[in-house]
């Protein structure tokens, strides 16, 4: 009985509130640890002075690997870190990683579903040195064309923005690489709604079909397409692309005047016309487009290195569809009409110049 009463008393003691007296300190618990002492140093088991912080190159490589993370926020933040590292590096200093190692990881993000990731990716691409990007145009274009023909309207607009940046930094390489001319033009006409069976059967008397095709094109851009902003970006990128591909060279008129003056000074007694046609060709294979002894080839995947070849293909395959589409866009007026005027200007100059001298 005594032991039982003692156990009950001890259990009851745990639930009793101790009465404190005035001026008397509270009793310290049994697991109390005295921290009133002062130490000159604190030693941790895992602390070591020999472990150094990761270098900037190591952090760059780490964030580059995080661009394939499943989290949209992680991918966006990693791209922001990469952009800051490239922009803030000293002038004329090399990149933490070569562009040949950076681009293969970044290219799939052109088709990323997150709008924030694609926006940050474009900022990163603009921070890359243009001279280093020119050698990798052939790797970029397939992803850009896939984005231009994507089902998502926002993704199509982002792909066109990437293409506009690429044409700005490496325009000559874009239009001259394999598939860079015909395939990209097909993507443009597909996105704009100009490359359709109705447009090929269009006649001057069917103005209703033009307005119908314009409304269908506008609807393909989603809610933002009602304001025409995606259409303006598309037309602006198309104007830049055509200017690089078939635009009249700035030195063309100056070169012809200079050649005529030199001929007159040399003492030619007869009028000389089209002198450039009798000179040594500038291209290594001027008659390669005839394909006299070659096997049947894929025109869409070919390289059109000269303006003459690009204009010949454009005039035979795309000129009619582009002119009909521009007429419909010009009829809409507003900002879309002004944007189409830029494309029309480039097209008129190219037609006036023709295949070349």
Curated annotation (Swiss-Prot):
It is found in: Nucleus. Residues 1-27 are annotated as: Disordered. It comes from the Eukaryota. Coiled coil: none annotated. Keywords: Nucleus, Ribosome biogenesis, rRNA processing. One of its GO terms (cellular component) is nucleus. Residues 1-11 have a biased composition (Basic residues). Its main location: nucleus. Transmembrane segments: none annotated. Component of the RIX1 complex required for processing of ITS2 sequences from 35S pre-rRNA. PANTHER family: REGULATOR OF MICROTUBULE DYNAMICS PROTEIN, TESTIS-EXPRESSED PROTEIN 10. This is Pre-rRNA-processing protein ipi1. It comes from Aspergillus clavatus (strain ATCC 1007 / CBS 513.65 / DSM 816 / NCTC 3887 / NRRL 1 / QM 1276 / 107). The lineage of its organism: Eukaryota, Fungi, Dikarya, Ascomycota, Pezizomycotina. The gene is ipi1.
């Amino acid at each position: 009985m005594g032991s039982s009463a003692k156990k009950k008393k001890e259990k009851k003691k745990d639930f009793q509130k101790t009465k404190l007296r005035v001026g008397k300190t509270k009793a310290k618990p049994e697991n109390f640890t005295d921290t009133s002492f002062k130490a000159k140093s604190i030693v941790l088991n895992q602390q070591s002075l020999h472990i150094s912080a990761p270098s900037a190159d190591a952090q760059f490589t780490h964030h580059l690997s995080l661009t394939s993370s499943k989290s949209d926020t992680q991918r966006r933040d990693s791209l922001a870190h990469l952009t800051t590292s490239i922009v803030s590096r000293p002038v004329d200093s090399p990149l933490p990683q070569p562009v040949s190692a950076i681009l293969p990881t970044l290219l799939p993000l052109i088709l990323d579903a997150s709008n924030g990731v694609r926006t940050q990716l474009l900022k990163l691409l603009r921070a890359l040195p243009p001279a280093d990007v020119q050698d990798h145009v052939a790797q970029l274009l397939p992803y850009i064309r896939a984005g231009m023909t994507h089902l998502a309207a926002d993704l199509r607009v982002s792909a066109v923005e990437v293409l506009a940046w690429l044409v700005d930094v490496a325009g000559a390489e874009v239009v001259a690489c394999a598939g860079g001319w015909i395939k990209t033009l097909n993507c443009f006409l597909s996105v704009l709604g100009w490359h359709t069976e109705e447009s090929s059967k269009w006649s001057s008397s069917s103005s209703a079909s033009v307005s119908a095709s314009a409304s269908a094109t506008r609807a393909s851009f989603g809610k933002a397409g009602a304001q025409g902003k995606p259409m303006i970006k598309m037309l602006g990128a198309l104007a830049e692309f055509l200017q690089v591909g078939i635009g009249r060279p700035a030195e063309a008129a100056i070169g012809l005047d200079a050649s005529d003056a030199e001929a007159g000074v040399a003492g030619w007694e007869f009028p000389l016309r089209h002198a450039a046609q009798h000179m040594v060709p500038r291209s290594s294979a001027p008659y390669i487009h005839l394909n006299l002894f070659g096997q049947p080839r894929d025109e869409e995947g070919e390289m059109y290195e000269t303006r003459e070849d690009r204009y010949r293909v454009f005039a035979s395959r795309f000129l009619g569809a582009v002119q009909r589409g521009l007429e419909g866009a010009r009829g809409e007026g507003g900002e879309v009409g002004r944007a189409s005027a830029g494309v029309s200007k480039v097209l008129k100059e190219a037609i006036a110049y023709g295949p070349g001298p």
